[in-house]
């Protein structure tokens, strides 16, 4: 008889890992299932992920923030240029009790940090490189591994395997889709004069952001409306 978990979580990305860790701190038992290899990610690339100060407070509250492991750059000042206006707005951390406005983190290093914590947690059983099928969605929920006779059981099932989740389709879960008719691009480049500052520009052709990676480089993110794609030499 397989051990029954409180929660079964399918999908070991940022949402799946974070959900598992928060539930584990409430002393629930979790089986975290990931289709790919669940391991520390080694990468020299910087993929920016913006976190608000409230998100960082939440992570710190649950002991899930460690600046020595996570590649992060604080945002102390945000400059916003509005569409169809000459107005420029500036937000400064000095106006908010001296706290940073947020941070730009490297997605890979943040996910690696969460993965390492999941693997060390006694309340989380990680099953990776696994394809599973749903046998029963009534409690206890049962999932079976397609390449073995193993069965995973739990009281609750949480699906976090992405927007195109096959599990959600199989369970006929309702969803809403929004088409912004945009294509996004991201570039990293050397630039030394944007220490802890970020820019966001709204224009007729799209939304542009300049985000600090570190003291030596920035990420440029452009979300272009598809009708204007040909105006740019990306």
Where do the protein language model's features map onto the residues?
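N-terminal glycine-rich dinucleotide-binding loop that anchors FAD/FMN and/or NAD(P) in oxidoreductases
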Residues: 45-70
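Conserved FAD-binding catalytic core of PHBH/FMO-like flavoproteins
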Residues: 163-234
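Rossmann-fold NAD(P)-dependent oxidoreductase module
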Residues: 22, 113, 117, 188
């Amino acid at each position: 008889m397989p051990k029954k978990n409180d929660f079964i979580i399918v999908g070991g990305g940022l949402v799946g890992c974070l959900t598992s860790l928060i539930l584990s701190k409430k002393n629930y038992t979790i089986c975290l299932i990931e289709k790919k290899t669940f391991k520390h990610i080694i990468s020299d690339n910087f993929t920016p992920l913006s976190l608000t100060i409230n998100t960082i407070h939440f992570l710190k509250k649950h002991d899930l923030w460690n600046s020595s492991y996570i590649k992060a750059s604080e945002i102390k000042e945000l400059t916003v240029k509005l569409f169809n206006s000459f107005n420029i707005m500036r937000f400064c951390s000095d106006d908010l009790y001296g706290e940073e406005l947020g941070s730009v983190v490297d997605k890979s290093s943040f996910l690696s940090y969460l993965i390492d914590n999941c693997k060390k947690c006694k309340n989380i059983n990680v099953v990776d490189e696994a394809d599973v099928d749903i046998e029963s969605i009534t409690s206890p929920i049962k999932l079976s591994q397609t390449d073995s006779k193993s069965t995973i059981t739990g009281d609750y099932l949480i699906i976090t395997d992405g927007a195109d989740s096959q599990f959600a389709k199989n369970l006929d879960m309702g969803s809403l889709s929004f088409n912004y008719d945009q294509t996004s691009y991201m570039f990293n480049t050397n630039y030394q004069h944007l220490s802890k500052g970020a820019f966001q520009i709204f224009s007729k052709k799209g939304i542009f952001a300049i985000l600090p990676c570190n003291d030596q480089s920035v990420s440029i993110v452009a979300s272009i409306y598809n009708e204007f794609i040909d105006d740019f030499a990306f």
